[in-house]
Each structure stands twice: as structure tokens, then as C-alpha cells.
Design a protein with these regions (language model features):
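Bacterial N-terminal signal peptides that target proteins for export
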Residues: 2-12
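A short, Gly/Thr-enriched small/hydrophobic beta-strand-prone motif that recurs across taxa
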Residues: 30-71, 186-197
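C-terminal motif of bacterial Sec signal peptides marking the signal peptidase cleavage site
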Residues: 21-24
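Structured interaction patches on ligand/partner-binding surfaces of diverse proteins
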Residues: 106-110, 132-180, 281-310
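Mixed-charge, low-complexity intrinsically disordered segments
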Residues: 52-80, 136, 140-155
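Hydrophobic, glycine-enriched assembly/anchoring segments
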Residues: 298-337
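Tryptophan-paired
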Residues: 68-139, 204-298, 327, 333-337
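Acidic, serine/threonine- and glycine-rich low-complexity intrinsically disordered segments
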Residues: 146-252
């Protein structure tokens, strides 16, 4: 497992704490007066380094690429959204790590405010954004500080994430005086997009998946876990005679591994992309080996060409490739052909 890298999209939670006065106890349990403190949360979007329109405009510059970019814009903007749909807040006592308070709030905006009440104590606050909205990720171990995780659906192959996932962790010492805290919500997933140019070659279909990305994220210590193996099925769009295979996933490991390829060679990669091209009378499978890690909050675009045999040839020299000609469907990952 690896520590998360603070990259890309960020939201900020500003926390202001003040002693509760008598008027704040109206309509509340009076036994709590003098023991609880009012915590006012302000959730707002601060900046978005991963600006999808800017990245697509910079990377996809030809007329054909711009047509493809118009098809990629909506799904990628949803992943790298500038708003939060919902917020899941957990307050754990320290040092025991037991859950003391839990709240969920619908936001659907870049800015929201609400109030919670906490007793004088040391806490660690863990905040999750969009974890409920994302159907392929579950919140697990929510009753204990060190077990709270974002976990992908357990399966050999899953679809691409559709939402950006954000988390924060904040140590809080509630004392009988006014205080303020600031906690950043960082994006914990990412996305990659393969741009495929078939040229004059007649391609009947394209499918693919992303491999070697994390499956779980431990929120309290900000680490990704890779013990389970799940590949993420890429989504296909087309435009301008080009194909785009995009997938939103968790990040890859930081350190590349060495793989033995089917071409009796070795390749180093932090993550891999599998692509199957259907030609008129055959299938060709290409595995791309990407040595540069895929970071949290990042949108990575890799351009390739499809040659007359259906092989995918990357434009980047540091991306390796191995090819299986006359590949047979079945017995591989469950991807649409």
C-alpha cells in the first residue's frame, strides 16, 4: 500500500468552534447545556487543478480530436466535478478510536453550512464526499477510526467510477474556548483516457480495461490497498473517426513492477491498459505498460494509433506494448466486445 498524494481537485472544510450559549439550547436537551460545543461547518470549493476542459483543449488539438473531446467532456466533468453531492461526517474519540457522532448531509453545491454539537474531548474527524453517490464504492468499517475504508465492489471486473471521491481527516481538541479548524477534502480517485486513431484501417469495434490500480482506501491513515485484484472496464466514446476509452479508477502504486509479456520480453509498469480491437476477421489484444504512476486527482491522456493488424501503438516512447494477434474472446476479463 502507498500513501496518498495530495494532487488535483481540492475542497476545503472550514470549521469554526464556539462555546454554546444559553440561547443555543432552545429546543435542545437542556442536560447538554454547558457540556456541548457548537461546530459550524462551511464546505466550499477552493480550486480545481484538474480542469477537464483545459486539459482536453491542451491535449486534443486536431479537428478530429476536438470532436472526440466533445464526447469526453460530460462524463469526465462529472468525475472531476466542482461540486459535492453529499458529505458523510464521522467524529471518533481519541485515543480509543470509537465513533462518537455520525452525520450525513446532502449538499449538491460548491458551498454549504450546517452545525453539529460535540462534547469537550479530543477527536479525529473523517469526512467523505460522494462516497454514497458512487455505486461501485462502499463505506466499510465505519464504527472504528482505523477501519473506515472506501472499498470498490468485490468482482473480477467492474465498470468505471462515475463520481469523484473526496476525503479529509482532521484532529480536533474541543476545549471550553472559541476555536477554528480547517480541513481539506482531497480527491482520492482519478481517470485515464486512451485516444485511438485507426487511420484508414477498418475497425469493427474497440474495448478495454485498466489494471493494477488500488481497490481500497483507508481514510484515517490515507493509504491505498492493492491486496485484491479488480480491473476497471473502460467506457467507449467516438468522434471525428477516433475512439476514446476512458476509466475513472483509484490510483496506481508509486513503484513500477516488472512484467513478463506474451512476447517473451519484460516491461516495467505502475499500471496497465488492456485493449481489444475487433477487425473484420480477427481480434487483436494489446497490453500497454505505463511506468509513470497514475495519481489521485489526475486525468491522464495517452494517444495511440491502430495499425492494419489491429495492434495499438502508443505515441509515447516510454509506454511499452505487447500484442496477441488472433486473440480469442473468452477466458479473459469480462469486457464488452
Amino acid at each position: 500500500m502507498i500513501s496518498t498524494l495530495r494532487y488535483g481537485v481540492r475542497f476545503v472544510v472550514a470549521v469554526a468552534i464556539a462555546t454554546a450559549c444559553l440561547t443555543s439550547c432552545i429546543d435542545e436537551d437542556l442536560s447538554e447545556c454547558g457540556e456541548n460545543y457548537t461546530i459550524d461547518y462551511t464546505v466550499r470549493h477552493v480550486y480545481q487543478q484538474t480542469d477537464v476542459p483545459t486539459i482536453l483543449e491542451r491535449e486534443l488539438t486536431t479537428d478530429a480530436e476536438r470532436q472526440l473531446a466533445s464526447q469526453l467532456l460530460t462524463p469526465l466533468n462529472r468525475v472531476f466535478a466542482t461540486t459535492v453531492k453529499e458529505l458523510d461526517l464521522s467524529f471518533f474519540g481519541k485515543p480509543a478510536g470509537n465513533l462518537i457522532r455520525h452525520e450525513q448531509h446532502e449538499i449538491n453545491a460548491a458551498y454549504a453550512q450546517y452545525t453539529v454539537y460535540l462534547k469537550k474531548l479530543d477527536y479525529r474527524n473523517l469526512a467523505l464526499a460522494n462516497a454514497i453517490a458512487e455505486p461501485l464504492v462502499d463505506i466499510k468499517g465505519a464504527e472504528e477510526l482505523n477501519s473506515l475504508m472506501l472499498c470498490q465492489t468485490v468482482a473480477d471486473t467492474i465498470d468505471s467510477h462515475t463520481e469523484g471521491l473526496f476525503t479529509s481527516r482532521l484532529d480536533m481538541s474541543i476545549r471550553d474556548k472559541s476555536q477554528s479548524y480547517h480541513a481539506d477534502l482531497y480527491m482520492q480517485n482519478c481517470a485515464s483516457c486512451l485516444v485511438l486513431d485507426p487511420g484508414d484501417n477498418k475497425v469493427m469495434g474497440v474495448s478495454g480495461y485498466v489494471d493494477d490500480t488500488a481497490t481500497d482506501f483507508a481514510v484515517s491513515d490515507s493509504t491505498y490497498h492493492f491486496a485484491r485484484h479488480t480491473v476497471v472496464r473502460s467506457s467507449l466514446v467516438s468522434g471525428g473517426g477516433l475512439y476514446g476509452l476512458y476509466a475513472a479508477t483509484m490510483p496506481s502504486a508509486d513503484t513500477p513492477k516488472t512484467y513478463n509479456t506474451r512476447n517473451s520480453t519484460t516491461e516495467k509498469a505502475a499500471w496497465r491498459i488492456g485493449v481489444v480491437v475487433r477487425m473484420a476477421d480477427s481480434y487483436t489484444k494489446t497490453t500497454l505498460y505505463v511506468p509513470q504512476p497514475l495519481k489521485a486527482g489526475e486525468l491522464r491522456i495517452i494517444k495511440c494509433k491502430i495499425n492494419s493488424r489491429g495492434e495499438v501503438v502508443p505515441n509515447l516512447q516510454n509506454v511499452g506494448a505487447s500484442v496477441e494477434l488472433d486473440w480469442k474472446p473468452g477466458g479473459d476479463h469480462n469486457i464488452d466486445l
